[in-house]
Amino acid sequence: MNNARLLWCHSGVVNVCLGEQTFTLVAGDLLYAPEGAFWSDTGSGLILELRFRILGIDGPARRIHLGRAWAERMVHEYSRSLFGEDAVSGDVAKLFADRVPTPPLPAPRHARAVAQTLAANPADQTSLEEFAAQRGVSARTLQRQFLSSTGYSFSEWRAAQRVCVATSLLAHDFSIAVVANLVGFSATSSLTRAFRRHIGTTPSAFTTGGIGMGVAGTPAAIPSRTTFAAATRDQQLWIYTGTATVTTPGYCRFLTQGDMATIPAGTHTRIDVAAGSIAIPVPIGVGEQGMSLQEVATLRDQEPSTGLMLVEESRWVHLGRELLPATAPVSL
């Protein structure tokens, strides 16, 4: 089973450690943590951990900035993960597929050490000859190691690395002139030429066109959804936003934002959530007053499993013959 996950920074600023890597996330950042990566965080922000059996994302850990416009869309995705959905939504997985790739690290040790230095400080202006002298090899040898191992010459690799870092900075609303300086280009025109060569567009078009790690565009609307579930232990359902209807044998309740409904163990439950609405399962015994995403995330850290098992609709008809017809939810 894949234990890779997505970490959504819903608010504040959080430092997330993945092994030897540290990522500083701000509200609107989404981080991919690959399989086998253990994570911890410090800071005052709120991280929502999205666990799916199927992510459709691979490669190293990486961060993209979606912005606050994606906040409710990602809370919806968090809700899907808590309900036990198998796979992350395709549009979310595609965000990582579209990103500007980091140039590969060279395998030979001298070139690899140089590449790691440049990755840590893209603005480093050390020349190929100076790096070669530091490593005790010829400039020709170092150049050959870059070309044979990555397909890039030394200068091309450095430019590709700078462009990759620049896309992340542009996504965090730094100006093009500031970004050019931060990643080591002498002028914005140099950054523009590198952008055209490596990703086929200009920095200004990148920040307005929804390409890769730039602006992610407008998220898809949250659809209505019907979930058929069997509760293995007592559970509650909290309406984060919008409306929903919970139907169990002999019982039907219409819920609005902030409401909480109890789903007893052994109950077969139909949950109809209106378009634009989000319902989140929470452990039993938590009151409606003061419920928040922060509280949900804390509780789920302590008790990851919700105790809800999804049931196929065809099997549901057999399990819950006595269900009342569900009242159609009304969008707010």
From Swiss-Prot:
Gene3D superfamilies: Homeodomain-like (1.10.10.60)
UniProt GO MF annotations: DNA-binding transcription factor activity; sequence-specific DNA binding
Tree of life domain: Bacteria
Induction and repression of expression: Repressed by DtxR under iron excess.
Pfam family, one: HTH_18
Keyword field contains Transcription regulation: yes
Example GO biological process: regulation of DNA-templated transcription
Domain HTH araC/xylS-type: 112-209
Annotated keywords: DNA-binding, Repressor, Transcription, Transcription regulation
InterPro entries: Homeodomain-like_sf, HTH_AraC, HTH_AraC-typ_CS
DNA-binding region: 129-150, 176-199
Protein's job: Under iron limitation, represses the acn (aconitase), catA (catechol 1,2 dioxygenase), leuCD (isopropylmalate dehydratase), narKGHJI (nitrite/nitrate transporter and nitrate reductase), sdhCAB (succinate dehydrogenase), pta (phosphotransacetylase) and katA (catalase) genes.
Protein name, as recorded: HTH-type transcriptional regulator RipA
